[in-house]
Structure formats: C-alpha cells, structure tokens
A protein has these predicted regions:
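Core catalytic alpha/beta fold that binds nucleotide/phospho-ligands
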Residues: 1-155
Length: 155
C-alpha cells in the first residue's frame, strides 16, 4: 500500500447522542458556544430546521462534529508518539468541522492549534469521515503528509 507511508496518525471517537444532547441541554451550560464555532452551530441549526420531526437532529449533528474534534486530537497525538504534546491546552473552537457544498465534512485547525500542528508535523492533510447510526455518532481522522503519494497515484 504505497499511500500508507504518508500516514502520520489515525484517530477514532464515538459519542452517545442522547448523553450529548443532555449535556447540551443543561441550563446555563456554555458547552455549545465554548466547543463549536458559529459556523458549526449554524449548520447544526439548519439541519434541525430541515428535520423538525427529529428532536435529536441538532444534537446528532453536533455529536458527530465533537467526535471529529476528539478523533483529530487522537490522530495528532498518535503522530507525536514518544514526544510531548505540542500544545498544553487545545481550544475546541480552533478545530472547526464544516461541510463543503456537497455535504462532505472537512476539518480545519486554526489559531494556536493550527500553528502548533504546522510546527509539530509540518504541512498535513486532514482526512475526515463522520457517521451516525442509531444512538451513536462516530468519526475517524487520518493525518497524512501533504502531497503524500496515494494508491490512486500508483501505477
């Protein structure tokens, strides 16, 4: 597998949607605004409006995004195995998960987190997959060297 040589780290995370919805619903909680960017919240609110019969639509969307953020931190940590963390505190708002015009999710580190990723790993590609099945949201993140050869590039 020629593409594997460019893989730096892989992360996976699962989130229970019901428990996550309860955390979001705690009165006075700032979890949503301290964890999700305005763009992420707007996308989740839009999904909720599109699916009024689904009381968990917003929480499901945000649970998947939170799983992606957690999976990213695990992939970054795996890429630095044997070395100290590159950042003492990760700010969730610096890890944004949005969708492209065709609905595919992408993850964009920014701020101190983006700078620390660049400094600790160099230029990387962030590959993200999010899924929802029943009461669970899950995400996988693969960090790869930017421009690394892939199986598609192989003869």
């Amino acid at each position: 597998m020629s593409g594997a040589r460019g893989v730096l780290g892989v992360g996976l995370d699962l989130v229970d949607v019901g428990s996550f919805a309860e955390q979001l619903g705690i009165v006075g909680s700032a979890m949503a605004t301290e964890t999700f960017t305005p763009g992420e919240l707007a996308e989740a609110d839009a999904v909720s409006r599109e699916r009024p019969a689904d009381p968990l639509a917003r929480a499901r969307r945000l649970a998947g995004r939170f799983a992606a953020k957690e999976a990213f931190t695990k992939a970054w940590s795996a890429a630095r195995l044997g070395r100290a963390p590159a950042l003492s505190t990760l700010r969730w708002l610096d890890v944004e998960v949005l969708t492209d015009p065709w609905g595919r999710p992408f993850l964009r580190p920014s701020g101190d987190t983006g700078a620390a990723v660049l400094e600790s790993l160099g230029a990387v590609e962030v590959h993200l997959s999010i899924t929802h099945d029943g009461p669970v949201a899950a995400a996988v993140v693969v960090l790869a060297e930017a421009g690394a050869p892939s199986a598609v590039d192989s003869p």
